[in-house]
Amino acid sequence: NLAYVNEQVNAEPEIYTIYKKDANGNYLRDEQGKKIPEEDPDYTGTYRDIQWKNKTITELYYPGSVFKVITAAMGVDSGKATYYTTLNCSGAYGVAKETYHCAGKKAHGVQNLAEALRNSCNIYFIQLGQRLGSSVFYDYFDAFGFTERTGVDLPNETGMMKYYTKSQLGEVELSSSSFGQAMAVTPLQVCTAISAAVNGGYLVTPHVVDKITDQNGNVVEEIGANVRRQVISKSASETIRQIMEYEVGDGTITGGGSNAYVAGYR
């Protein structure tokens, strides 16, 4: 039950306390040595701002293995990989002076692209990133919308994403970026990018308003889909759909993305 899981995940409250400081920035303490909290009874405005902060567009995070879907799309669209392209994972992989591992230092062996995504194999995607090269990788990264705001019709969307530019993508930076560990972006950016990977290749501006009406209910403006650009081909997008369906399975497999399987949904 996705609604139940969401309710449980979001049930944890966040509590903030503001403490007094002196002119030098030192905390004021009582006779027991405890910090003295502010006594102004009206912090409702501050708490309200925190409560209504939309973290999906105002805060950054490192997407990690979720980004492997995007690297897979880059590989398929560029012709550097297909569903069946095999690469070997020995559990450790050296790039310059860095050594990368998969989770638990597990060696996945020879696997194709779909199997690598199911196994969340870091080493496979590092090698795929190397096949792409810094220039091609960055061009796709930019095309998927990670260097700009999504344009969603909500206030305060941040534009302060963190990532390596094309000239900064050296061997190590490219390797770390290929499995989502070297960029900080918003959750909504990731959502729109993955949508583009599976919807036929189109990067679409997300929106929450369907239409605007006047006081009499007359439609003043219809808010239609705004396709910003086509990032990958329809055929590449179809391959990514097939791979992601393989990850989820039919509800009988274990591991991979099996927990995301929902009967009746493709």
Question: What do these predicted regions represent?
Answer:
Residues N1-S65, I70-R266:
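Beta-lactam-recognizing serine transpeptidase/beta-lactamase-like catalytic domain environment
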